[in-house]
């Protein structure tokens, strides 16, 4: 599945549900590894509150939970014009979608990972600046708990970031990993860095980090495992609008 938000109006999105009023949330799907794609499927009415100004995807990537539930991170501007991050999910392979409660107010671009069976972590861009907001849910977003690392462990300059969970059986370290990438700074969008956590996101030691680009760029990124030894990162760098690099885990995690 690929999730996009389409703005029909020329200038802005407003409360409402129709294309003339508000941005439309669309899905396209592929059943042949991306060779062909379906026509867009409009799911706005399934997940958007009419009072919201708009509802957007993460951006970044969604996940499939161990029980098969599909999950996308989302963000929306509520009736008071405050941004909020959360998740939407499907338990029937994308036929129907559901959205419950926001994870933390005044947050926007987020990424989701299943850190334990049934436990989702949402890592969020926080408009307060300085560091990432992090929350967890055990009930698909009905209730949220602030994570101990929230607003302290991962610095940011108010920018998008990427987060993935890599299970022990799927990587050469034999340990459960969280991998994270963003501009590792509180000012500007520079020092694009990949970090690893071996304790479920509580800590991100400097010995488990690799700097990719220290110069100024746009700073958005997306991580994905290539094989058990290698993670790929697609990011906005200082040398090109979009750059792809393949990084060995042994260059990130020094044991």
Where are these regions (language model features)?
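Asp-box/BNR beta-propeller blade signature and adjacent active/binding-site loops
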Residues: 1-255
